[in-house]
């Protein structure tokens, strides 16, 4: 079984690429979704978040206060790293469990999709890495429409991620998301065949 880490900045199209890889037969572990689940459901993670960022990190109904946490995390240097230090070890444990299940079930390609793959050390948990990059103006337009946030908020999040140039340097494969959806589908298929050898 091959493990592939897929990353890219906010709005780059990495989740779309992973969807195309799933169509080819890959299994995808969505690290960002797992992190959100852990922040909501894992008692140790919740307690550490409250200790680090205050009780306002959760609403009275016990749901995560995403707006408050985003303001806390993206508003001051070092706080993103603090949150990641709480959540990422648990995400990696979940990925290792997913890897064992996938191997037992005969999966040929397991994809680890993560916005902060390199920053969190996730590249050490996979065989091959791929980065999805896209023009900044397109990324900002997509995210503001998708998440109902301002362009300034998107840029603030971008500052906490590797630049596209750094991603190009560090990744084994780079997918340029600068064309149509069909272009991205074709590039995703090419990536699939390159990393699996057609298996």
From Swiss-Prot:
The lineage of its organism: Bacteria, Pseudomonadati, Rhodothermota, Rhodothermia, Rhodothermales. It catalyses: 3'-dephospho-CoA + ATP = ADP + CoA + H(+). It is found in: Cytoplasm. PROSITE patterns: DPCK. Belongs to the CoaE family. InterPro entries: Depp_CoAkinase, P-loop_NTPase. ATP binds at residues 11-16. GO terms for molecular function: ATP binding; dephospho-CoA kinase activity. Its EC number is 2.7.1.24. This is Dephospho-CoA kinase. Residues 3-199 form the DPCK domain. GO terms for cellular component: cytoplasm. Catalyzes the phosphorylation of the 3'-hydroxyl group of dephosphocoenzyme A to form coenzyme A.
